Amino acid sequence: MVLSRRISRVILAAFTVVLSASAQAEVSEVTLAKQFGIGSLTFIVMEHQKLYEKALAAANVGNPVAVHWVKFTGGAAMNDAILSGDLSFALAGVGPLATMWAKTRDNIKVMGVCAANSMPMLLNTRDPRVRTIAHFSSRDKIALPGVKVSIQAILLEIAAAKAFGDDQYAKLDPLTTTLSHADGMAELLSPNSPVDSHFTSPPYSYEELEHVGIHTVLNSYQILGGPGTLNTVYATSRFRQENPKVYAAFLSAFKEATEFINAHKREAARIYLDVSKDKSATEDELVKMLENPDIRFTMAPEGTMKVVSFMHEHGRIKVEPKVWSDMFFPEVHDLPGT
């Protein structure tokens, strides 16, 4: 498989960095951040199978490395943890990555490690009046993982710019509120909640549609004109430079987890349910999602430049990358990203 060979070269390149680095002690612990939903499935498989621990052992780091997993509700809090040095690897959308890349170019230089997956995000509602985003009014409230900063918030602005004109890109922002995916679904399904709409990712987006009266207003792939990365992994340049073996081991483990998901979808679904304790979908429902061709687990970024260019045009980031690879470490530059 061409992509698999390319990713193998990624790992080889990372280990080349290891061999050229001067001998020094690397970190004794690594902290990785997950979010809610199957967008975190690669990390969940890594955690369950202890793939990172195995890769670290094989890398001969020279000192024990403890692996810690933490969970965040969105990219904003994750970015704070990266800035404070409390987080080694973040897992969040293209928006949070672009924000950090532009913000830290002159200091800690946060960059993308790889993409995690591409999945359609759905804006669902229980309001029968709302068939397009033009039907939203002040009476509506839209839940998403982070107002203004989450990938869902940015995609909503892109859709608004297309529907109402570029100068009206923020028209729907006052209707948005920050909630985790699980809490957003709970509010949407509660008839007495002021939150009547939810912009979210699988499995929550599909599970919501199983309930009577819920329908989809917008699909992120429609906004982007094709597949788009849901989550990326990112870290600081300093972490990569000072911990080359630990960094290379991460890439190796992440590649293994990605290949496992693509080859063993039912087992991956079981692992997700076992680790996450998520009650929003059954095993069979998860397998159906994982078999959906629109849901792809790939380390190659997709559709990132459309999001990042919009962010730059509207002042969300001060500098715009010329190509997607400007935001990512060189180990993945050979992948077919967009």
Where are these regions (language model features)?
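Conserved C-terminal helix/tail region of periplasmic/extracytoplasmic solute-binding proteins
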Residues: M311-T338
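Bacterial N-terminal signal peptides
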Residues: V10-S20
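Short, glycine-/small- and polar/acidic-enriched structural segments
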Residues: E26-Y169, D173-T178, N192, D196-P202, ...
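Sec/Tat signal peptide C-region and signal peptidase I cleavage site
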Residues: A21-A25
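Secondary-structure end/capping motifs
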Residues: R240-K318
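Bacterial N-terminal signal peptides that target proteins for export
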Residues: M1-I11
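Pocket-lining segment of extracytoplasmic ligand-binding domains
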Residues: A182-D274
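Small-molecule pocket liners
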Residues: L41, N117-L123, I214-H215, T229-R238, ...
